[in-house]
Amino acid sequence: TGGLDIKPSSGMLLMKKDMGGSAVAIALAKILIELNFKINLKLLVPIAENSISEKSMRPMDVVFSRNKTPVEIGNTDAEGRLILADTITFAQEGETKVDLIIDFATLTGAARVALGTEMPALFSNNKKIAKTILDNSLKKNDPLWELPLFNAYQRFLKNENGTLSSTGFSGTGGAITAALFLQKFLKNNVNWVHVDMMGWNLTDRPGYPKGGEASSIRALLYALNELFN
């Protein structure tokens, strides 16, 4: 619903698809297991119910992330990046070396404004991995488009009080600033892929019925096979 920054009723109607990133992550992990991929795989699924109650976060509240970073809540409807940030932190804990973190999320409307509903936005800090994914997206007719981790936009995430803004304050480039926010929780520049997706077909088209859509699975599956298997 958006929490205290509540969505209009029309904006809530499709929110049953807001678990699309988790669905894709679970599906991809299931396929990798069934195909007996020779990788050490960890699946993490952060889940939140974002409704109004006496315990609701307020805009401009400051909370501490799992790694103790102070984060100012710019908009309570942007809860996904908060739980993703903590999950990225959790994924790097322990003594096992992490070679790659992939996250899937129905994160921003800005990605839909940039690319429409049928093409997820891809971000990565590793050009080779990004190219491998994009090449396989073309081969398997599973379209993604890379957007930049434009470093100059980092300044939009830093508040005057020294905290990290969860949403930034530029008003534009929201998919990029959301990705930059998540990137701040990587340690030692670990290889990372972020997929900002719709997870839903608004209309019927051949092979893609109206409803939930498992976009990016084929592209990532074949890319991982090429990179690691």
Name each region found by the language model.
Residues 1-229:
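A generic structural signal for tightly packed, nonpolar segments enriched in small/aliphatic residues
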